[in-house]
UniProtKB/Swiss-Prot annotation:
Entry's localization field: Cytoplasm, Nucleoid
Source organism of this protein record: Rhizobium johnstonii (strain DSM 114642 / LMG 32736 / 3841)
PANTHER family: TRANSCRIPTIONAL REGULATOR MRAZ (PTHR34701:SF1)
Gene Ontology cellular-component annotations: cytoplasm; nucleoid
Annotated protein name in UniProt: Transcriptional regulator MraZ
The entry's keywords: Cytoplasm, DNA-binding, Repeat, Transcription, Transcription regulation
A Pfam family the protein falls into: MraZ
SUPFAM superfamilies: AbrB/MazE/MraZ-like
Family in the record: Belongs to the MraZ family.
Endpoints of the signal sequence: none
Domain (SpoVT-AbrB): residue spans on this chain: 7-54, 83-126
GO terms of molecular function: DNA-binding transcription factor activity; transcription cis-regulatory region binding
């Protein structure tokens, strides 16, 4: 099965592009993803990225709600108002736009984080801190990490 796993940090080039890790590009190719759906994560200061199926999953959740309900409107605000479509260039690079930089605080490096069915873009130190916090919370709760 193709899953986005692990993490890797890559430097942004002078033109504002970053190479997507080859393992992540392989998953995108296996899934035949041509266009990336990118949205501002609901919990973390990260950009979540997947194929159009990720957007479709959220839209099915909205469609199951009363279209005038606060839940449906809030979800639409997040996934439509906080989302964009992007493409990788021929060399497997992603343009690190103001949309990405402004939400994440990314400047010269990007940490790619696998999240099974999608991946995320993080400012490297923010990822390290969030991972340490998650590990600490699990340890306090007596759960194995």
């Amino acid at each position: 099965m193709s899953r986005f796993l692990s993490n890797a940090t890559n430097r942004i080039d002078a033109k504002g592009r970053v190479s997507v890790p080859s393992a992540f590009r392989s998953v995108l190719a296996q899934r035949n993803v041509q266009e990336l759906y990118c949205f501002q994560d609901f919990v973390f200061p990260a950009i979540s990225i997947g194929g159009p199926d990720l957007l479709e999953r959220f839209e099915r959740q909205i469609a199951a709600e009363d279209p005038f309900s606060p839940d449906a409107n809030e979800m639409s605000l997040l996934i439509h108002g906080g989302g964009v479509f992007m493409k990788l260039d021929a060399e497997g690079r992603l343009m690190v736009t103001d949309f990405i930089r402004g939400f994440t605080g990314i400047s010269d490096e990007v940490t790619f984080v696998g999240r099974a069915d999608h991946f995320q873009l993080w400012q490297p130190q923010a990822f390290v801190a969030a991972q340490a916090q998650a590990r600490g919370e699990r340890k306090l709760a007596g759960k194995r990490s």
